[in-house]
From Swiss-Prot:
PROSITE patterns: NNMT_PNMT_TEMT, SAM_MT_NNMT_PNMT_TEMT
Keyword field: Catecholamine biosynthesis, Methyltransferase, Phosphoprotein, S-adenosyl-L-methionine, Transferase
Residues the record lists as Phosphoserine modifications: 7
PANTHER family per record: NNMT/PNMT/TEMT FAMILY MEMBER (PTHR10867), PHENYLETHANOLAMINE N-METHYLTRANSFERASE (PTHR10867:SF18)
Name of the protein in its database record: Phenylethanolamine N-methyltransferase
Family: Belongs to the class I-like SAM-binding methyltransferase superfamily. NNMT/PNMT/TEMT family.
InterPro entries: NNMT/PNMT/TEMT_CS, NNMT_TEMT_trans, SAM-dep_methyltransferase, SAM-dependent_MTases_sf
Length: 283
């Protein structure tokens, strides 16, 4: 669903599965700036209305981190895409953050922002909004400074491999928490592949650790420049079942219906889900 915050992270690499190989090939045409324009500039990037999709996602994340239960030392963002908003509330709770993406162009886009280089996408509206809803009196500059300081590395990832980060990864493993936004459904050719990808990333998480998963509901395609990318449509119950099969207790699962004025023709998304799940001890 390129709809709202997706990080459609092209986390599929060519391997023995022809469906996954086709996904990986399609993502070679992914244009990060077009994706950002479609989803993070107005109208979807308008954060002034509390009913908008952007405020909803940021609120879900902020409220979950405000519980104090999702914390630790190391967090991995799975399939970051070219976006950083999904970590704005997380960065106060983890001192070592790893961002990941299959596509080099997305990793380069993230690097521009982290290094504060000219031409980097401006996330300050998102940072300001997070500071507002968290209510700690923090400035957006302080928020962004903290996030930049705590992102220690940007790594390649392939969620369709049993070891998504490869062997000898530089990320501290197992992580205390995972975040993933608009990745798994956007890079999986079918529901079985989605389930396997979820199983694979779960190996990166310690027992008792937390997964915050954001994704598209009932979406089959989205645009990112010249690329028209297929998405496996999932419903709320399928997400819940997949999490249970991967060994999670679902702590919270919320859904958002995409309003008509935000259905802008860049995808066919019907809604968004936010899941907070905890990996069962012993899994």
């Amino acid at each position: 669903m390129s709809g709202t915050g997706q990080s459609h992270a092209a986390d599929a690499a060519p391997d023995s599965d022809p469906g996954q190989a086709a996904v990986a090939l399609a993502y070679q045409h992914f244009e990060p700036r077009a994706y950002l324009r479609n989803n993070y500039a107005p109208p979807r990037g308008d954060l002034s209305s509390p009913d908008g999709v952007g405020p909803w996602k940021l609120r879900c994340l902020a409220q979950t981190f405000a519980t104090g239960e999702v914390s630790g030392r190391a967090l991995i963002d799975i399939g970051s895409g070219p976006t950083i908003y999904q970590l704005l509330s997380a960065c106060a709770h983890f001192e070592d953050i790893t961002m990941t993406d299959f596509l080099e162009v997305n990793r380069q886009e993230l690097g521009l922002w982290l290094r504060e280089e000219p031409g980097a996408f401006d996330w300050s509206v998102y940072s300001q909004h997070v500071c507002l809803i968290e209510g700690k009196g923090e400035s957006c500059q302080e928020k962004e400074r903290q996030l930049r300081a705590r992102v220690k590395r940007i790594l390649p990832i392939d969620v369709h491999q049993p070891q998504p980060l490869g062997t000898g990864s530089l990320a501290p493993l197992p992580a205390d928490a995972l975040v993933s936004a608009f990745c798994l459904e956007a890079v999986s050719p079918d529901l079985a592949s989605f389930q396997r990808a979820l199983d694979h990333i779960t190996t990166l998480l310690r027992s008792g650790g937390h997964l915050l998963l954001i994704g598209a509901l009932e979406e089959s395609w989205y645009l990112a420049g010249e690329a028209r990318l297929a998405v496996v449509p999932v419903c709320e119950e399928e997400v819940r079942e997949a999490l249970a099969r991967s060994g999670y207790e679902v702590r919270d699962l919320r859904t958002y219906v995409m309003p008509a004025h935000l259905r802008t023709g860049v995808d066919d998304v019907k809604g968004i889900f936010f899941a907070w799940a905890q990996k069962k001890v012993g899994v």
